[in-house]
Amino acid sequence: MLAAEGGHNPIIPEPVEIVVGLVAFLLLLFVLWKYAVPRFEKVYEERSKRIEGGIEKAEAAQAEAQRTLEQYRSQLAEARAEAARIRDDARAEGQQIVEEMRAQAQAESERIVSAGQSALAAQRAQIVAELRADLGRQAVDLAGRVVGESLEDEARRRGTVDRFLDELEAASAPASKA
């Protein structure tokens, strides 16, 4: 059957169809180029500006965040330095308090030792005086018994006893130093 029609090929379009299709394509191309492409360009440009603005805003926000971070870091460093200074001051103050307490304890110790030595010296002097008086009375009583008479003359007796005790003390002092 195809052979009977004679030379018409269904794959190849008719020349009129090619011309109409070409005119319609050119008309569509003109309409798109005149109206649609400028709108697409405008939308594309607005979108590019928004993206660039967003990038600039993001960069500005990042720079602000970096400045804030640096501020926080410097404040943190200042706070650490302040804490270290306070710690050092507290240590120094504690050391000073310890030194003051030591000095007070040393002074109190020296005062107590001095008071004890003074009390001992006073007691020793009192005991020596009491022993001298007692020794003097006993010596007079013994001398009175040996002699057989009473040696009641107080002034003479005291002078003799005191002189004897002084000589005895003087004799024992070099012996105790040696």
From Swiss-Prot:
Transmembrane helix in keyword set: yes
S-S bonds: none
Bilayer topology annotation: Single-pass membrane protein
Primary location recorded for the protein, binned into one broad class: membrane
One GO cellular component, as annotated: proton-transporting ATP synthase complex
Entry-linked Pfam families: ATP-synt_B
One example GO MF annotation: proton-transporting ATPase activity, rotational mechanism
Domain of life: Bacteria
Keyword Cytoplasm: no
Keywords assigned by UniProt, alphabetized: ATP synthesis, Cell membrane, CF(0), Hydrogen ion transport, Ion transport, Membrane, Transmembrane, Transmembrane helix, Transport
Localisation: Cell membrane
Stored NCBIfam families: ATP_synt_b, PRK05759.1-3
Subunit structure: F-type ATPases have 2 components, F(1) - the catalytic core - and F(0) - the membrane proton channel. F(1) has five subunits: alpha(3), beta(3), gamma(1), delta(1), epsilon(1). F(0) has three main subunits: a(1), b(2) and c(10-14). The alpha and beta chains form an alternating ring which encloses part of the gamma chain. F(1) is attached to F(0) by a central stalk formed by the gamma and epsilon chains, while a peripheral stalk is formed by the delta and b chains.
Family: Belongs to the ATPase B chain family.
Protein function: F(1)F(0) ATP synthase produces ATP from ADP in the presence of a proton or sodium gradient. F-type ATPases consist of two structural domains, F(1) containing the extramembraneous catalytic core and F(0) containing the membrane proton channel, linked together by a central stalk and a peripheral stalk. During catalysis, ATP synthesis in the catalytic domain of F(1) is coupled via a rotary mechanism of the central stalk subunits to proton translocation. Component of the F(0) channel, it forms part of the peripheral stalk, linking F(1) to F(0).
HAMAP family, per the entry: ATP_synth_b_bprime (MF_01398)
Name by which UniProt lists this protein: ATP synthase subunit b
Organism: Saccharopolyspora erythraea (strain ATCC 11635 / DSM 40517 / JCM 4748 / NBRC 13426 / NCIMB 8594 / NRRL 2338)
Lineage of the species this protein comes from: Bacteria, Bacillati, Actinomycetota, Actinomycetes, Pseudonocardiales
